[in-house]
Amino acid sequence: MKQLLEFIPLILFFAVYKLVGVQAAAITLVLATILQLILVRILFKKLETSQWIVGLSVIIFGILTAYFDDLAFLKWKVTIINGLFAAVLLISQYVFHKPVVKMLLAKELSLPTQVWNRLNLGWAIFFIICMLINIIISQLFSDDTWATFKTFGFTGLSLVAVIITGIYLYPYIKKLENNNEQK
């Protein structure tokens, strides 16, 4: 449900962009994001740090995009956010030796340290790849192509990353289930 709420502003942005243009799409994105943050807060009683960061960046860069009628600001947002997430994951692992992924999921999963580290590194690499893809598409292709890829391409890539994560974790989850059944 939460993921669906997070996807709605993006779909609205895409539809308004295709029908009306950049300025109206950016305003729609900002308003839909504000509404989405409020709904998540009401329904789930909490906003995650990443939701605050993404939400505020959408609002700031969306307002700049609407004001200047220039999609470049939203293009930068995607690059900056992906770079920021990658940096946080890498710093948490290599500087503080406490992978963010472990901090987020340790209550649900008990995994060996090397698995947490690989998982954390895998997601950092994913965000770096998304950042680089965004730079390439935003600079070498039309705004229409970028908007389409931003809406559907990154969503598809995220789904693939989640599936790969599930496949990677499956043996460990199965092992945990077997251990719990034996108790």
UniProtKB/Swiss-Prot annotation:
GO cellular component, one term: plasma membrane
Main location class: membrane
Transmembrane region(s): 22-44, 53-73, 76-96, 121-141, 153-173
Entries under InterPro entries matching the protein: YciB (IPR006008)
Pfam families: IspA
Coiled coil regions, renumbered to chain: none
Keywords: Cell inner membrane, Cell membrane, Membrane, Transmembrane, Transmembrane helix
Topology with respect to the bilayer: Multi-pass membrane protein
Domain of life: Bacteria
Signal peptide: none
Subcellular location: Cell inner membrane
Job of this protein: Plays a role in cell envelope biogenesis, maintenance of cell envelope integrity and membrane homeostasis.
Family the UniProt entry places it in: Belongs to the YciB family.
Protein name from the UniProt record: Inner membrane-spanning protein YciB
Gene symbol of the encoding locus: yciB
